[in-house]
Amino acid sequence: MLRFFLACTLLFPCLANAGSDINPASCQRIAMGPGPDDMHLQSLAVPRLIISSHDRRHFRNHGNLYALPLDSLKAGIMARTGEPDGFTLRPHGLDLTQRDGRWWLYVINHDKELFSDQHTLVIYEVVGDTLIFQQELHSPLLTAPNDVAVADNGDIYVTNEREDGASIAEFLFLQRKANVVVYRPQLGWRIAADDLAVANGILIQGNTVWITQTLGEGLRRYQRTSDGRLTQMAQLGNLSLLDSITVRDNGHFLIPAYPSLPNFLLHWQLPGQRSPTKIYDVDPQTGQGSVIFADSGRTISAVSTALAIKDQLYLGQIFDAFVLRCPLPQ
């Protein structure tokens, strides 16, 4: 996500503002920790969001995982138990799954340095308001992980923004080396797909896998093979500068984008500077999208996740310390 921006800031023009279905002035801020980048709905008697939080302006700081009940809208840090000595959590992308009545949370966990190849994937069981540590997966293939998604058979897919997480050259020259890796307990980690331009969001629907790219154009669609590899790639549409991907009730996708990379960089370094954002409603049949939310950055900057729940839209972001809740026209 944010790792590539320094290199590409001067290479892309700012995109023009577009109209939207949602008036940002109608939205409500919900306070929590900095950088609530990713979120997933846990469907309980009282539904709640589980949200990753990390201060990416001070990357070495530890982060937290929050629970946000949708009735009270009061976020709280989730307790964590069983973590090994010396463990530090700097969460990024998440996936939340339910199997046999038990909930499992998969968390991209970053090293203390922005440019590093020492990242991991952490698995917790969610029991009430507590996260019980289960496993931390290490691999040299977790080079610059961004997002994670788990298939029905337990295969774990992770998007990497770069092939070499410690490579500044790959960053500066915008080399098309990003990939998706897959983990299966019997086989370990392997590359599932490559030749991506900053692989970002990932969504699995049965044997179909969707990938967003931040530098590459269009939404990518793949088919899973029996060994977990991704084949039959199709590129749909021409949207670019994309982040995560979620599904609406109508089957369309919600995908945030960054209209101005120079403003994003300024916002990263100077909190008072604003960074515009857009949310696309994307037809998965064509990859074409319409803007349902656009903001100059005055209401929220650098949205990274958009999640629709009934008639409300919840927006996470990369840096600032709140989630935005907006009425969603039906």
Label each PLM-derived region with a short phrase.
Residues 63-71, 118-127, 173-185, 273-285:
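Beta-propeller blade signature
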Residues 86-92, 103-152, 162-166:
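Asp-box/WD-like beta-propeller blade repeats and closely related beta-sheet repeat scaffolds
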Residues 63-99, 105-111:
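Blade-loop segments of beta-propeller domains
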Residues 33-46, 61, 83-98, 139-156, ...:
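Beta-rich, blade/repeat-based domains predominating
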Residues 51-61, 107-115, 158-176, 255-274:
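Short, conserved, GDST-rich strand-edge loop motifs in beta-rich repeat architectures
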Residues 19-35, 75-79, 287-295:
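A short helix->beta-strand "capping" segment at the edge of beta-propeller domains
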Residues 238-291:
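Loop/turn-rich, solvent-exposed surfaces of beta-rich toroidal or solenoidal domains
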